[in-house]
Amino acid sequence: MNCIQRPETDRPAWFVYIVQCADGTLYTGITTNIARRITEHNSSAKGARYTRSRRPVMLVYRETCRDRSEASKREYAIKQLSPTRKRTLVKASEKGFSAIYFPSYSIKGQ
């Protein structure tokens, strides 16, 4: 499963995102508002504990998902990847490829 296309609904879109921290590490999360969440990571106590000591963070990847459940499953799958494979995913998205080209990144059994 990949969070590539989302049918039109009244519900807000959910996003899976990856930020690169100041120390070069990657953090993966989910949200309905990426701009707000990046601001929280960079400036407020609402940012993830992991990113608070690694500011500033920069958005390097995002996927749109149908709902929170799908976003959570995709987040889990990405968090299981090695740092090298996460960077491959980020680089592929920079070149215009979507996660659909990386079936090994999808959730097992889906």
Curated annotation (Swiss-Prot):
Domain GIY-YIG: 12-88
Alphabetical list of SMART domains matching this protein: GIYc
Name of one Pfam family that matches: GIY-YIG
Gene3D superfamilies named among the record's database cross-references: GIY-YIG endonuclease
Classification via InterPro entries: GIY-YIG_endonuc (IPR000305), GIY-YIG_endonuc_sf (IPR035901), UPF0213_domain (IPR050190)
Cited PROSITE patterns: GIY_YIG
Disulfide cysteine pairs (residue numbers): none
Similarity comment text for this entry: Belongs to the UPF0213 family.
Protein name: UPF0213 protein DP2720
Species the sequence originates in: Desulfotalea psychrophila (strain LSv54 / DSM 12343)
